């Protein structure tokens, strides 16, 4: 196989991408990971991860992603900290171009694991206090707000769900929405309204997030009167949706209206030989552990597909690796 041709090329370096790489490399598939310039994905912005199995004392998001990368690299996965700027999935081998090189990389199969990002308001305080009280995931971080007061911005089902999750821990949740009416479904809205810990502040926009080293409050403005006030809160949660990082694959694979990659069969996309894993195709869970599981499944699907095409004859099943192979890999 030429130096520029791989059995599997994985685009993305979060839990899904690194897990896919681990399984691919351990199956003796020639594997390349385009990590992108944001190595590790959204977990690089997470201070404490306490809901991933195996880290009983919790772990910093960046440290966790370092572990993922090292484990995949240990078995021979090649890493490149480059963004993919163009792909051609119209014929095989597939071709992918990075921003660093004019010549393409060739792939017998591709796993899309580019993830999705929470939408933000674009406030200076959001980026400055990211992971220091600013979050886009209540399921991930609600535990840290026991007995505290938090603000949630949004008006759809996501906002109602985030507020409800936070209310299990926080003493008070203020749900802020710029309109008087909500896009949320009736049942989700009623559930939030009936929760005594959740208060609603409508017709209001957030002007700034306050605090030096951690969130201390938010400055809000009434859209009707222009009157401003400061709310003292310990945390701020954006719940205005997510944006999948799929623009480079636009027109290459089928996506839904939100830009999420459509999985036609298991993890395979509309293009045979191209698979999707993690938040890039997950509109519901968006958890590190589910993304990692997706990465595992995508590689298993890719390996089986390659075998069906007669292109993975030399690949070994991870389940039948010999002790000698394990010892060799441990010394890498």
Region annotations inferred by a language model:
Residues 102-200, 209-211:
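Predominantly flavin-linked oxidoreductase catalytic cores and closely associated redox partners
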Residues 72-99, 105-107, 167-264, 304-332:
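A Rossmann-like FAD-binding core segment of flavoenzymes
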Residues 6-75, 148, 160-186, 201, ...:
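Beta1-alpha1 glycine-rich phosphate/pyrophosphate-binding loop at the start
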Residues 5, 122, 128-144, 239-287, ...:
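FAD-site-proximal beta/loop scaffold in flavoenzymes
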Residues 14-15, 38, 116-118, 157-158, ...:
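Residue-level detector of alpha-helix initiation sites
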Residues 160-162, 271, 280-328:
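A conserved FAD-binding loop/helix module that cradles the flavin
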């Amino acid at each position: 196989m030429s130096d520029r041709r791989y059995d599997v090329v994985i685009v993305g370096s979060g839990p899904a991408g690194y897990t896919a790489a681990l399984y691919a490399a351990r199956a003796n598939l020639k594997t390349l990971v385009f990590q992108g310039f944001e190595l590790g994905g959204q977990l690089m912005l997470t201070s404490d991860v306490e809901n991933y199995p195996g880290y009983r004392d919790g772990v910093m998001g960046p440290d966790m992603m370092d572990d993922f990368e090292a484990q995949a690299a240990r078995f021979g996965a090649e890493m490149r900290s480059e963004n993919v700027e163009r792909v051609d999935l119209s014929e095989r081998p597939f071709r992918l171009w990075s921003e660093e090189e004019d010549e393409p990389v060739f792939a017998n199969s591709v796993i899309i694991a580019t993830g999705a990002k929470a939408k933000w308001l674009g406030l200076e305080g959001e980026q400055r206090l990211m992971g220091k009280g600013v979050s886009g995931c209540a399921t991930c971080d609600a535990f840290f707000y026991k007995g505290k007061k938090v603000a949630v911005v949004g008006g759809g089902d996501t906002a109602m769900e985030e507020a409800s999750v936070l209310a299990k821990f926080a003493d008070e949740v203020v749900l802020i929405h710029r309109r008087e009416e909500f896009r949320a479904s009736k049942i989700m809205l009623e559930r939030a309204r009936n929760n005594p810990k959740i208060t609603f502040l409508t017709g209001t926009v957030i002007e700034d997030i306050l605090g030096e080293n951690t969130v201390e409050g938010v400055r809000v403005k009434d859209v009707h009167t222009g009157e401003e006030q400061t709310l003292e809160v310990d945390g701020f949660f954006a719940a205005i949706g997510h944006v999948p990082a799929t623009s480079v694959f636009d027109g290459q694979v089928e996506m839904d209206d939100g830009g999420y990659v459509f999985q036609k069969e298991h993890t395979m996309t509309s293009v045979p030989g191209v698979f999707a894993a993690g938040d890039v195709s997950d509109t519901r869970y968006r958890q590190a552990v589910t993304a990692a599981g997706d990465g595992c499944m995508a590689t298993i699907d890719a390996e089986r597909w390659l075998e069906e095409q007669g292109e993975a004859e030399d690949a070994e099943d991870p389940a039948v690796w010999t002790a000698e192979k394990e010892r060799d890999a441990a010394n890498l």
